[in-house]
């Protein structure tokens, strides 16, 4: 993740970098579909196909990580600070929209033609995306013969940043404690996010007595509301809070934690549990947008946005992975066997999830930038790091 972001920041052809990733992803999907058609019967044929699938799916996942960093860096190049949040909100919601249309598009193809054609259909969708990237995505205003965005909008770029190379700014961002504090806040938020996504259905079944279908319907509400939260959050801070996103992130984090408590400690009524997921889904969409990217690119120079996104992204997914391990061990340590049935005590895991959510919104208070009019003071980029020290690294 960090390597892709560093490369995506340094390259002057971010559109080509993103297109290359999508080409690899589309090719992997197409080959999997073709391999499915050619797969022979028997143990050896199935083993070969399985190995092929594992390799290509790994390539697919790696290639898809080449999409986010160039997109975020391009956003920071093309849009001024005063409207960056608004456009980043739409960008953040694109992941949810992509999943939604994937279910409709690929699901329909698989239902009509079989799973092999589902991969082929995904490859076609990727080809369309490649054409859009090549035709419409451009690296920066300068790449199209325009002045930098600072000149176009009247923003001032500090002399400190003018004197530093992209690589030096990236190294400064990596040493910035505020970047790591934001990354830790995002990791804690991901603990709460994947706690609900991963364990919410089982919790509703075990603790509140819902059926599998009912529990799945309740938890699915939060995914849909995440789109609404992501789209609205950037515009709200641009319009009413003048870019002070940590203030809104703190308030939203507080509501998110309250929604978790409502979900885990309320009764078994359908309405109250749906309400908790409405609140949780909306707020988690906002927090993913803020902590997962927008605040990260606010506190560093444009030249270091890719490296910062890489740090936050990697730390967030480490948090999600640790959540699975810790939650699984807590649930396993407190399970009770009644006859042949296993029942889980969710109390220790629930306290862990709520504690992580609380720590997330407390940490975010310390991460901010100062904006006065159209000037962006990046004093949080740790100017104590001298150029001489940079040259020694």
Can you say where each PLM-predicted feature lies in the sequence?
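Single conserved hydrophobic/aromatic residue that forms the stacking wall/gate
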Residues: 1-8, 384-393
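Cytoplasmic membrane-interface "Motif A"-like loop-to-helix N-cap segments
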Residues: 10-22, 239-253
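C-terminal ends and interior cores of transmembrane alpha-helices
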Residues: 23-45, 255-268
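Hydrophobic core of transmembrane alpha-helices in multi-pass small-molecule transporters
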Residues: 28, 44-65, 272-287
């Amino acid at each position: 993740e960090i390597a892709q972001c560093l490369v995506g920041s340094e390259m002057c052809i971010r559109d080509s970098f993103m297109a290359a990733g999508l080409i690899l992803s589309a090719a992997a999907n197409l080959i999997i579909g073709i391999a499915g058609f050619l797969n022979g019967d028997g143990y050896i044929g199935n083993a070969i196909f399985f190995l092929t699938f594992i390799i290509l799916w790994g390539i697919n996942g790696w290639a898809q990580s080449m999409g986010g960093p160039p997109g975020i860096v391009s956003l920071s190049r093309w849009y001024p600070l005063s409207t960056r949040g608004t456009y980043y909100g739409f960008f953040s919601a694109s992941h949810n929209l992509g999943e939604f249309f994937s279910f409709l598009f690929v699901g329909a193809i698989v239902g009509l033609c079989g799973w092999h054609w589902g991969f082929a259909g995904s490859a076609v969708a990727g080809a369309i995306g490649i054409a859009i990237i090549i035709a419409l995505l451009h690296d920066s205003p300068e790449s199209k013969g325009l002045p930098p965005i600072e000149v176009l909008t009247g923003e001032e770029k500090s002399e400190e940043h003018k004197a530093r190379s992209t690589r030096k700014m990236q190294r400064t961002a990596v040493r910035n404690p505020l970047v790591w504090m934001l990354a830790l806040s995002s990791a804690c938020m991901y603990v709460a996010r994947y706690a609900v996504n991963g364990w919410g259905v089982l919790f509703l079944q075990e603790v509140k007595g819902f059926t599998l279908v009912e529990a799945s319907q309740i938890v699915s509400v939060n995914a849909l509301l995440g789109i609404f939260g992501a789209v609205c959050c950037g515009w709200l801070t641009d319009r009413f809070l003048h870019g002070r996103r940590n203030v809104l992130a703190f308030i939203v984090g507080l509501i998110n934690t309250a929604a978790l408590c409502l979900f885990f400690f309320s009764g078994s009524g359908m309405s109250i549990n749906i309400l908790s997921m409405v609140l949780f889904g909306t707020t988690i969409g906002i927090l993913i947008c803020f902590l997962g990217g927008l605040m990260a690119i606010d506190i560093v120079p444009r030249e270091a946005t890719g490296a910062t996104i890489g740090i936050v992204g990697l730390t967030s997914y480490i948090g999600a992975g640790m959540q699975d391990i810790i939650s699984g061990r807590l649930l396993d340590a407190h399970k009770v066997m009644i006859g042949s049935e296993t029942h889980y005590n969710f109390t220790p895991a629930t306290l862990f999830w709520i504690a992580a959510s609380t720590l997330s919104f407390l940490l975010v208070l310390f991460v901010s930038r100062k904006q006065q009019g159209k000037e962006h003071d990046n004093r949080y980029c740790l100017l104590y790091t001298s150029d001489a020290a940079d040259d020694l690294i």
